[in-house]
Amino acid sequence: TKLFKKETIENLFEHYLYMLTDIIENVDAKIKDIDIITPKENKLLEKFNATDGEINNDTTAYLIEKQVDENPNNIAVICEDKVLTYKQLDDKANSLANYLIKIGVKSNDIVCIMTNRSLETIVAMYAVLKAGGAFLNVDPTYPVDRTKYYIESSRSQYVLTQKELKDRVKEIPNCIEIDLDNNIYQENKDRPKVNIKMEDLSYIIYTSGSTGVPKGV
């Protein structure tokens, strides 16, 4: 009793009795098949694991838009001393999404986002989803060769970036560079009418790769 609480001893004894009963009733059972968990505990485990629920088939863009409609003036994004309300975020994303559609971005097209940590990163991700595309975030501190590999292997033709990073993007061939600091937010702020399906691609991330070569998934 100095080592264990009374409840612990009672539980151990209950398990021991249950195991002995199981052995007596199943004399040919293998050790690995002997159960020490009581029926009462099994029911408790089943209750804990009862996590079945309805699957929400709404897209990410739709769920954010729903939040915009319900709480337009609530703060959606904070980065350092800058903030965007849900309405401001939606307006900027709509404008950028309409611009992307205008220049040719279609469903499942990969759009690379190479930005410093900023509000524009979130706006760009949201806008790409609204346009029906899939985003690929690339750290601007990566070496040019690595960035080039990501963009080429993902077959991305568009790069959303910022003024201070434009020179890095220019080193990558066959890419349409879009400056987020430009006046692209002056486009139509209406929500794009794009038929986005649940099975459409949403984003790509690159793993380190078991062979040492990053893989996009």
Question: At which residue positions do the language-model features occur?
Answer:
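Short, highly charged C-terminal tails/helix-capping segments
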Residues: 32-44
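Short, contiguous pre-domain boundary segments
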Residues: 46-49
